[in-house]
C-alpha cells in the first residue's frame, strides 16, 4: 500500500481518496499536508525535532556545511528500514522550497537558525555556503534564493534512498553510473524515489543559467523510459482503476517532455507528447477560419485557430478552486479583446489554408504527427472537432492544457525568434487555453498569461497590456517589492499553485523578474532593466545589459567586482572573456569550475581568431577544447554539431562521423546532421552507410534543401540505385527550377538515366511499363520541357526518349526546339565556337528531318511526321547561312552547310 499512497502523492490526488484506503494514517496525514500545500508543517516538525543538532566544524564553507549535513543525516535522521519516512521528508522539503521560490506565497520558517543553532552573521554565511553548494559545473546557483537548505537536504535524502552516489561529492573529472530502472526488477517505492529525485534535480537545474553537468544526465536517464511508471503500476492493487494508471503514465510523459525542454533536448519532445495525447484521448487541430480582430472591421479575414476537445478528465487529481491571477483588459480603441471567428464550415474554398501554402500536396490535407496537427482543408478536420463553436469551445482538462503549453515551449525552442507565422501559432495555442469557461488552475492560467504577455510586448498595440500583465504576475508571487500594482490577496490557494508545478517548465520568481528586465532592455528602458538586475543581485546579467548597449567598460567593471566578491564564479570569468576576447579568462573559468561555455568560446576563438589577435585558425586546438566541453556535458547538440563540422573541415573524418552520430542520436530528425554524417562516411569509402544516412536525411524535413538531395543522388549513382537517382533528380528540379531554371538539370546524370531507359524495348502496352520506366518517361518528357530554355543537349535527350516511345513526331519537334535554342544565341555572329555548335545542331535537325519525316505520323496510317521535310531542310540551312554570311563565309562550318544543302 506504500506504493499506492506515493502514486497518489505523485498525482496530487484528492485528499479524501487517501482516507478511504487502508493506509497507515500517520503517512496519510503527511501526504495530506503535502497535497494541501502545507509541506512546511512537516518541515517545521522536522526542525523542532532536531533543533541545534547540526554542528559545523571549523570555518563555514561549502564543503564544511555539506559535511555537517551528511554527518547529521547519517547519525540523526537516516535509518535503514525507514526509507518511506525519509521519502516523505524529502518530498516535503522539496515542495516547501518550490513554494518559497517558484509559486509563492513563501512559508517563513527559521530552519537554518533552528537546525544549526546559528544567529546573526553566521546564518548568512551558512545560507551563502548552501547556495554555492547548488552550483553546477562552475555556474553558481542564484545566490538570493530563499531557503536553499530545503533543496540541499531533499537532494541528500533522495540520493541515500535511491542508493546513488552523491552529486555533491563528485568532481567534474569523475564519471558516475547512471540510474537503470526496470519495470520488472525495480521496486515500486524505489521508482517513486527516483521520480522525486529527478524532480529535485530539475529544480536544481532551474537555478543556474544554462543546463549542464551530471544533474542533467541523471535526470535524463531517470525519465528515459516509461519503465519508471510501469515499475510503480505493477505493484498497485488489482482493484485500482485503469484510469489511475493511465493518469500516472500521462504524467510521466508530460514530465519527460519537461525534462527534455530543461536540458535542451527539445527535439525528443514530440514522441512523448504524441503518447500523452493518445493516453488522454485529447483531440486538437490547428486550422484556418475567418475572423474579425478590430471593432470596425467589415470583412473577416482568414486566421489560425486551435480546435480542441478533451474526452478524458482527471478523476484522481486534486480539484482546487482559487482566485485566478489578475488579468488586464486590452482596452484598445481599435482591437477586440479576442478575435471573433465565423463558423468553421463557412470558410470559402479560396481562403482555406492550403490556398496560401505553395506546393502543398492536397492529398495530404491532415498532418497529425506534428507538434501542431494541421488540417489544411475543412474536410480534413476530425469530425469530433468540426462542430465546435470557435468562439465558445468546451473546457479542457488540466493535462490537456498542459500538453498545449508544452507544445508551445517546444515550438519556441525549435523555431526562429520573432517569426510572424510562429507567433500566430503560439497566439492560437494560448487563446485556446485562456478563453475557455469553467474553473482554471492557477499555475496553468498564470503561465499562459505570462507567455501571452511575452508575445504582446513585441507589438505596438498590445505592449502596454503585456507589460502590466508581466508586472502583475511577478508581484503575485509575493516578491519583496515596495510598491505593487495589485494588492496582495489573503485568499491564496497554495495547493492550486503547486498541483502541476512538476509538469510545467520551472520558472523561478527571479527569472520572471529578469525576463521583465529583458523586455525593458529590448524597449530601450535601460535604467529600469538595470534596477531590476541589481535588485536581484544578478551581476552577470547586469554586465550583459551594459555590454548589449555598447558600454563594455562598465560591463567589465561589474564583472571584476563580481569576481572579487566570488572568485569561484566561473560564469563571470567566461563572460568577461567573451567581452574582452581574452583566452586566459576562459582558461581560468575552466580551471575553477569546468564551465563548458568557456571551452566552447575557446573553440570558437581558435576556429576563427579575431583579426586583431593576429593568430591563424588552429583546428587541433579547436577540436581539443570541444572535446573537453563534451566530456563535461555530452548532451549538447550544438557542441557536437560544431565538433563534427570542424572535423569535416580539417579532414578528420573519424571525428566527424563520431560527432554526427551523437547528433543524430540526440535529434533523429535533424536532416543536416544525417547529411554531414553521410559526407564523413563517403570520405571514408563507406558508401552503403552514407546512402542509409542520406535516406534518413531526406525523410526528415529536408524538402527544400537541394544540397542534401544532390548528395543523395551522387551516392545513389555510385551504388547504381537508379530509381533513387531518378527520385533525387526530380526533387532537385522541383526545388531549384524557380531560381536556377535549367541549371537545376544535371545533364550527365540525365544522360545516364536516358541510356538505361532506352536499352530495353518499349512495350506494346503502356501497362507493361515498369515503375522506373513510367517515372523516368514522365520526368524526361513532361517535367524537363517545362524547364529547358537554351540547352539543345537537353532537347536531344527528350527527343531520344520520345523516339523510344515510338512518337517520332514528338521527337522531331524536340529536335526543332534544340536547334532554335542554340540558333538564337546572340554570340552566333561573333564566336566561331557558337557558330560551329549551331552548324552541328543544323546538321542534326536535317538528319532528323530525313530519318523521321516520312515515318507514320501522329494521326495513324496515311499521315506523315513531316510531309514537306525536304523544304524544311533547305529553309533551315538557308536561314542559318544568311545569318553567317559575310562573317563565316570562309569557315569550315560554312563549307559543311553548302555540302548539306547540295545533298538534299
Curated annotation (Swiss-Prot):
Induction (free text): Target of SBF and MBF transcription factor complexes that activate gene expression during the G1/S transition of the cell cycle.
A Pfam family recorded for this sequence: TPR_8
Subcellular location: Cytoplasm; Nucleus
Broad class of where this protein is predominantly found: cytoplasm
Gene Ontology cellular component list: cytoplasm; nucleus
Start and stop residues of the TPR repeats: 510-544, 563-596, 603-636, 637-670, 671-704, 706-739
Record bears the keyword Cell wall biogenesis/degradation: yes
Gene3D superfamilies: Tetratricopeptide repeat domain (1.25.40.10)
Keywords: Cell wall biogenesis/degradation, Cytoplasm, Nucleus, Repeat, TPR repeat
SUPFAM superfamilies per the UniProt record, alphabetical: TPR-like (SSF48452)
BP-aspect Gene Ontology terms: fungal-type cell wall organization
InterPro entries per record: TPR-like_helical_dom_sf, TPR_rpt, TTC27/Emw1
More info: Present with 8070 molecules/cell in log phase SD medium.
Protein family membership: Belongs to the TTC27 family.
Function description: Required for the maintenance of the cell wall integrity.
Name of the featured protein: Essential for maintenance of the cell wall protein 1
Gene: EMW1
